[in-house]
Every structure is written in C-alpha cells, then in structure tokens.
C-alpha cells in the first residue's frame, strides 16, 4: 500500500481526494 501512496495517480484514490 506504500507504493500506492507514492504514486500520484493512485495517491488520489488512496487518499480519497
């Protein structure tokens, strides 16, 4: 899950922006 937070594309989904 750490990689998802680092990726700008998946960061939005992971952070639920």
From Swiss-Prot:
GO terms for biological process: defense response to bacterium. It is found in: Secreted. Signal peptide: none annotated. The keyword Plastid does not apply. Disulfide bonds join 12-17. Expressed by the skin glands. It comes from the Eukaryota. Keywords: Amphibian defense peptide, Antibiotic, Antimicrobial, Disulfide bond, Secreted. The keyword Secreted applies. One of its GO terms (cellular component) is extracellular region. Antimicrobial peptide. Belongs to the frog skin active peptide (FSAP) family. Ranatuerin subfamily. This is Ranatuerin-2Ra.
């Amino acid at each position: 899950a750490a990689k998802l937070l680092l990726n700008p594309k998946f960061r939005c989904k992971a952070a639920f922006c």
